[in-house]
Amino acid sequence: MTESFGNVYEDTERARAYAQLDYPGTYYLAFRDLPMLVHKHVRGIRALDFGCGTGRSTRFLRNLGFQVIGVDVSQAMLAQARDRDPQGDYRWIGEGGLAGLEAGAFDLILAAFTFDNVPDERKIAALPELRRLLARGGRLLVVVSSAAIYLHEWASFSTRDFPENRTARDGDFVRIVMLDVPDRRPVIDVLCSDTHYRELFGAVGLAVIDAFRPLASGAESVSWVSETTISPWTIYILG
């Protein structure tokens, strides 16, 4: 990678844009099947939303009946989360990371899009900590952008202006524009293929129990583009 990595989400304008999102368009597919997967794989009600952003996934888990804590590295995102959900438990994780949380404290940890824009070294640092926080029999659900999302057009995203995405390899920067928000600056993510994710999980002792790739049925009231034939997301269930 030739560009410096920064926390693009520590940006007030982008945080405001994210706060307006619920589950429009392509994002709907990332969350549609989570209740089914949680019911199938998770026992217990203690949850951690790792990389909670503006809190939409935290609220989602609470609506499923979980006692949930949302954590993030972005103060700007957390400010939006607290504004929208004053009763929620949102915590900033700074230099100490997750060290302040008790080992084995969570039956479910959700990381929704948290790993999309971080390099390998940060994934490798975070994954053992998340494993440490899982209760016996607990599950880590990781929702990530599939490699295909950076190659096609979607109801909620565009990549047509970034042909260089096609030659990107694991660890390279890839760009994508969100169409559901006024802020049309490209989001810069770090490509991580399914094979590479599985290597990273295995390296820290996390087993892939299931992997789910959601598709649209075509019956939804959305003008899908690629979503009925190509999955934009992968949901890993780890333990």
Regions found by a protein language model. Name each.
Residues 124-136:
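A short glycine-rich, Lys/Arg-flanked "PGG" loop and its adjoining helix->strand segment in the class I
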